[in-house]
Amino acid sequence: MKKRIIACLLCVFCLLSAVGCTSSAPAEAAVSETTASETMVTESPTVEATAAAEGSASGDYLSSIGGTYVELFPELSKPEYRQIWIDAVTPLVGAENAEATTDMLLGMCMAGIYGPEATEKYAADPNSMAFDCYFLGGVQKFVMDGSIITGLDAEGKEIFSHSYQAMDVENENGFLFYQSEDENSGEFTYFAFSPDSMETTYHLEFRYAEDINDLQSWFEGNYAYWNAAGIAENYNLETMQNIIELFVTENLSSAE
């Protein structure tokens, strides 16, 4: 079983695979007891194995995730989906904790800083730790088409478009690495994908950088505390319900 760190640190409040939370605990107390040391997202072996198998079966993971992707967490946090969150977390943490739990789950993946700035801040204040799960480099949409990855800005203009080839890179995160076949690809030279798909986990997780060494750790280097998360642009309500339920169930059910 692979444990994937997504955001960090919500142990006593039973956010993200924590323990000890009960439905009778006041929300205010729960939030104040949040720690900054044990946040893990634990994916089920079945889901993860299926995602990895899809890539292998097709000969290449990248070719199996074709589509256009937007940032995940701005979509997850839209007001129209709030009740889905509340309905999902209430059975696990109680109605009195549902709002605070939802805010915390979302907030731990929506930090506005990463890299050395984040490392310095979190070293001084571990309880403030969170991950930046936004797209970087001005990209608002990623288009995956076979071996080609394209990034578009807010106006739909192309920022980059390169063909990528798979690499065999051993890394602590279990990510799948790709390298641009074009010279001077800048911060889009290397991509590292978690073996997710819209069919299995209803989202993608990936990182990219000019230096492959920056993609080896979530907690060190120029991209520390950054892990981009995307969802298919044409997702529907059922997909949104599925990803929220999966996220909540895998991160809170152990507290039951």
Tell where the protein language model's regions lie, with residue ranges.
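Calycin-type beta-barrel ligand-binding domains and close structural analogs
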Residues: Y122-E256
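Short, solvent-exposed loop/hinge segments that bridge or flank secondary-structure elements
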Residues: G59, V70-S147, T189-E199, E256
